[in-house]
Amino acid sequence: MSAKDVKFHDSARARIVKGVNVLADAVKVTLGPKGRNVVIERSFGAPTITKDGVSVAKEIELKDRFENMGAQIVKQVASKTADVAGDGTTTATVLAQAIVQEGMKHVAAGMNPMDLKRGIDKAVAAVLDELRKLSKPISTNREIAQVGSISANADEAIGKIIADAMEKVGKEGVITVEDGKSLENELDVVEGMQFDRGYVSPYFINDPEKQAAYLDDALILLHDKKISNIRDLLPVLEATSKAGKPLLIVAEDIDGEALATLVVNAMRGILKVAAVKAPGFGDRRKAMLEDIAILTGATVISEETGKQLQKASLEDLGSAKRVEVRKEDTIIIDGAGDQERIEARVKSIRTQIDETTSDYDREKLQERVAKLAGGVAVIKVGAATEVEMKEKKDRVDDALHATRAAVEEGIVPGGGVALLRARSTATSLKGANSDQDAGIQIVLRALEAPLRVIASNAGDEPSVVIAKVLEGKGNFGYNAATGEYGDLVEAGVVDPTKVTRTALQNAASIAGLILTTDATVADAPKDEKPAQAPAPELEY
């Protein structure tokens, strides 16, 4: 085990705060409509240019081990906020830095860090309650576009394309972001169910130009086990051949003799067939097979249902107007399932969404609802260069998460104004002692930080801007894009409540941990001696 370097008290905290400041200062230049770019070096290829706070935070590693601890702790604020809300990473980092800086002054003055933390937590809880009261739900296409535009750094084209996508596939629909082939952003809507499994063998391709297998008016066989023996498949193959229809086989896996026979018949044109692996794993795979069965009117051939592959008939097969099978995915369009059964299935999955406590499970269940109820929208991001494409794609991802968050919990006035207005309830709060009162005051001052940074990045004097905003009420605030004051909601400067709430919660949580730190432990630097120079060669 290597030797450790240990620091205590003020010495430990000072180095951590230095790391916090380095990371936060690099991230906060991106905040607001007039935020600046950050250029990040890449070991290979061109550097990345970004205005995305979390992308900047993820790249920062400091040489000093103790300072790096501070940077990595604050990096967690950005990452956690991005995971939960998808945006607000820069705001969260700015708030964390402000709480840490204010708090350290009080700790240095001899106040009890634990009481300061209790005061901070008390003030944050009051502010969060007020934020929920300020929040208003969004419903119109225009409001959704406004949220998307703000999150994409005032890019109205991105806001509009996200609003159009949500209108077409529903607010719970699946919206994916891909690299485009042109200079303009494009929106493609895929009707039907798409899942991320492609053909088992490229020999099933019947359109070499598009590298895909297209099956029109196809029958669909669903099996939850591996198919290796061709004898098991023969009854189904003979029945579909007589019916003169193409066949899609979805199974756990298809290999050996069964795959070889299908490939040979497909290549000779005797059978129009394609085989894909079933999507998902374990219980999720069973559920998704059942979804496909309900969508297409099929029965899953499974031991649990008492069905055997050898005895399967045409009645057990589903059908769809068109099936598209590519290398990475399969799309089933216009399945022949019963509409009432599909609606009942969607209702059942929505109940599971309400009951689940896991964010991952919730996301997967929402995807299943979207695939059954709507379609899949694909936003293709257009740009002139690869560097611009990556930067733009990051902004579209941010905007997409922000609009979903806004639909979920509503919106509040943007530009840092919501936090200023929400602190009104905390001004009258009292702690159990003077140290807790100081903790409450730390939060009240820190809530000004996002607006200060937005104003500073726009080239205005922060103190003047804050004084002017505090003179007004409600949605009145500073629009950094135009440099004017007015009703921010009316001007379309709004933030999702979930983003603002998550940013404050995570910032206060991490800042509280830093303030209550009293020792730090890191690997001691190794004393590596320089390599010995080789002996000179003797000349003869």
From Swiss-Prot:
The keyword Cell cycle does not apply. One of its GO terms (biological process) is protein refolding. It is found in: Cytoplasm. Its EC number is 5.6.1.7. It is an enzyme of class 5 (isomerase). Pfam families: Cpn60_TCP1. Keywords: ATP-binding, Chaperone, Cytoplasm, Isomerase, Nucleotide-binding. It catalyses: ATP + H2O + a folded polypeptide = ADP + phosphate + an unfolded polypeptide. ATP binds at residues 30-33, 51, 87-91, 415, 479-481, 495. It comes from the Bacteria. InterPro entries: Chaperonin_Cpn60_CS, Cpn60/GroEL, Cpn60/GroEL/TCP-1, GroEL-like_apical_dom_sf, GROEL-like_equatorial_sf, TCP-1-like_intermed_sf. One of its GO terms (molecular function) is ATP-dependent protein folding chaperone. The keyword Chaperone applies. Gene3D superfamilies: GroEL, GroEL-like equatorial domain, TCP-1-like chaperonin intermediate domain. GO terms for cellular component: cytoplasm. NCBIfam families: GroEL (TIGR02348), PRK00013.1 (NF000592), PRK12849.1 (NF009487), PRK12850.1 (NF009488), PRK12851.1 (NF009489). Belongs to the chaperonin (HSP60) family. HAMAP family: CH60. Forms a cylinder of 14 subunits composed of two heptameric rings stacked back-to-back. Interacts with the co-chaperonin GroES. Together with its co-chaperonin GroES, plays an essential role in assisting protein folding. The GroEL-GroES system forms a nano-cage that allows encapsulation of the non-native substrate proteins and provides a physical environment optimized to promote and accelerate protein folding. This is Chaperonin GroEL 3. It comes from Burkholderia ambifaria (strain ATCC BAA-244 / DSM 16087 / CCUG 44356 / LMG 19182 / AMMD). The lineage of its organism: Bacteria, Pseudomonadati, Pseudomonadota, Betaproteobacteria, Burkholderiales.
